[in-house]
Regions:
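Proteins enriched for Cys/Gly/acidic motifs involved in redox and nucleic-acid/cofactor modification
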Residues: 1-89, 128, 143, 165-176, ...
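Short, hinge-like loop/turn segments at secondary-structure boundaries
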Residues: 10-12, 97-99, 133-135, 202, ...
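Conserved, mostly hydrophobic/aromatic
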Residues: 44, 64, 81, 117, ...
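Conserved SAM/AdoMet-binding glycine-rich loop
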Residues: 73-199, 207-208
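Short acidic/polar active-site loop segments enriched in Thr and Asp
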Residues: 77, 113, 212, 217, ...
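Radical SAM enzyme [4Fe-4S]-AdoMet core and its adjacent flexible, acidic
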Residues: 90-107, 111, 157-158, 221-252
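Terminal RNA-binding accessory module
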Residues: 229-331
């Protein structure tokens, strides 16, 4: 659950008040998260985060670069930027440095092989960010864009900026500029007032866009939010049925898209080894850390000696709706 993961990662002491050298790396030794901001200025009517975490605040640019250098010195090869709204980074500072500058600077740190950014708010994704992701070989061609819904009525009720039409155009623009891009989203079904027509619009949208990755959750009331007071509520039974419909559609889409990887080769990082299956669990740039996007299971009959954290070449040999299967090959 990517949202639960973010809340876990974002729920600790403000890192810009910490000495980064006191930090403990609790993830895999070769992969780490870097929180670039605190709080949120978006007032989505289902979310209590702005009430809990306060207004959006970017961490100073040089503080982030220093911490990223420290992580690289500790052996971290992949750095994933996180925040409640990463696209807003730097807009509250007077440094003239924004998300694209942060991606660029971190990617140039010796030892860093890949930089990834999560949680991009749709209407704040600038051409500069798209171009940096497109043109920088050390930035993952991966857009995590939580859109939440596709009915304009529900988007308005959620207090989400932008419309379904805007989102369709944005995704088309990204895919035109970066043909091999991976686009992930999250959706909420059962938001108060969601009716059959609203849900049909969401279904049609999912079938049209064909996201590479999609997570869907049922709405849950949060006290002190506008959504908490909205009526009529959608029943738990209806919400679960709608969730299952979306997931069934996405499973078919994912199965088809995953099979298109077969026969292709990629660079991938080794996360772990499954001794029972005699396979390595690896990720290429299309797979975020912490099992968010499923797995790539790779055999090693190449004769190469490999270790956890190594970057290897793989060839995809098979696929299903959730996972890919590969073999490690020589360059």
């Amino acid at each position: 659950n990517i949202d639960e993961l973010f809340q876990k990662l974002l729920g600790s002491t403000k890192t810009y008040k910490m000495n980064y050298e006191d930090r403990l790396i609790t993830t895999l030794p070769h992969s780490a998260y870097l929180r670039i901001s605190e709080g949120c200025n978006n007032r989505c009517s289902y979310c209590a985060i702005p009430l809990i975490r306060g207004p959006f605040t970017s961490r100073p640019f040089e503080s982030l670069i220093s911490e990223a250098k420290y992580l690289a010195k500790c052996g971290v090869k992949e750095i994933t930027l996180i925040g409640q709204d990463t696209t807003r980074y730097g807009t509250d500072l007077k440094e003239g440095k924004y998300l694209e500058d942060l991606l660029h600077e971190i990617s140039n740190i010796p030892g860093v092989s890949l930089v990834r950014v999560l949680y991009l708010y749709p209407d704040e994704i600038t051409d500069e960010v798209i171009n940096e992701i497109k043109n920088n070989p050390k930035v993952a061609k991966y857009f995590d864009i939580p859109i939440q819904h596709a009915s304009n009525k529900i988007l308005k009720a959620m207090n989400r900026r932008g419309s379904k039409e805007f989102i369709v155009d944005l995704i088309a623009k990204i895919r035109k500029q970066i043909p091999d891009v991976t686009i992930r989203t999250t959706l909420i079904v059962g938001f108060p007032t969601e009716n059959n027509q609203d849900f049909k619009e969401l279904v049609d949208f999912v079938e049209e866009i064909k996201f590479n990755r999609l997570g869907v959750f049922t709405y849950s009331d949060e006290e002190d939010t506008k959504g908490y007071l909205m009526e009529p509520k959608v029943s738990e039974t209806t919400m679960k049925k709608r969730l299952n419909v979306i997931m069934l559609i996405q499973n078919g889409i994912s199965n088809k898209l995953n099979h298109e990887y077969i026969g292709k080769t990629y660079s991938a990082i080794i996360d772990s080894y499954d001794s029972q299956a005699n396979k390595y669990i690896v990720r290429n740039e299309a797979y975020a850390p912490d099992d968010v996007d499923g797995f790539i299971y790779a055999t090693n009959d190449s004769g190469l000696k490999v270790n956890i954290g190594d970057i290897v070449k793989i060839k995809i040999t098979d696929a299903n709706s959730y996972d890919l299967f590969a073999k490690i090959i020589k360059d």
